[in-house]
Amino acid sequence: MLFFSRTTRWVLAPLADRLDQPDQACTPLSSNNPLLRRILTGVEQLLQERSALKEQARALTQEVTQLDERVACRDALLRQWEARWALVSHGAGELFWELEVNGTAAPSLACAMRWTGSASILAPGIDQLGHWNEQLHPADRQRHLDTLARHLADRSGRTPFVLDVRIQPPSGDDYRWCRISGDSRRDAQGLPVAMGGSLRDIHQQHLQDEVLELAATRFDISREMLHDGLWDIEVVAGDPANPKNTIWWSSQMRR
């Protein structure tokens, strides 16, 4: 059994109280006994370190709370912008795409592609450049890759990427004409780091252009068969004598 002197007990009792309530302010303990003095000094240092750590933990907790609030605000803002983008892309009648180019002018057919929008001309699962290229008409596939490579290889960024291609719909129906266009973001050396664009169905417009071109060809043939000359005038501001009026003459009028 260990026995303590009265002096030792006189020191240990307040030390026990100090350890029971370490955060309560009190006068530092002291003793004439060298061993007790070392113990009291060590305990006081540990309590001070504990207090400092608690203060640091309190500050870190407050900082984490502030960061959580900022992250929550950013998440709310992100969801808001995502909802706006979904609304815009859904109402645009176009598909929007992103291509991972990885800083190369000749992207691999395995490069990832992401699509957003509501158009139904694209088959599901088109998540790579190669899969997308396979959906094009065989006569358009290499032309599509060549146009893409020329755009990415031009470090000045002046070569556009705009191309009319034929796409086979998921239903397996006849190919439809679509226009794919895009642009790339480049680093300081002009190497592409990101690329994106849109895909728009222009099939009806293409058919109308063909009809218009056929009508123009027929008109030219009919005009050449006539012996009478034809002419028309574009009247500016309703003034037949306006010198800015444009007059067109058929070839018979020039003979």
From Swiss-Prot:
Pfam family, one: PAS_3
Superkingdom in the source lineage: Bacteria
Record-linked Gene3D superfamilies: PAS domain
Protein name, per record: Uncharacterized protein in P47K 3'region
CDD domains membership: PAS
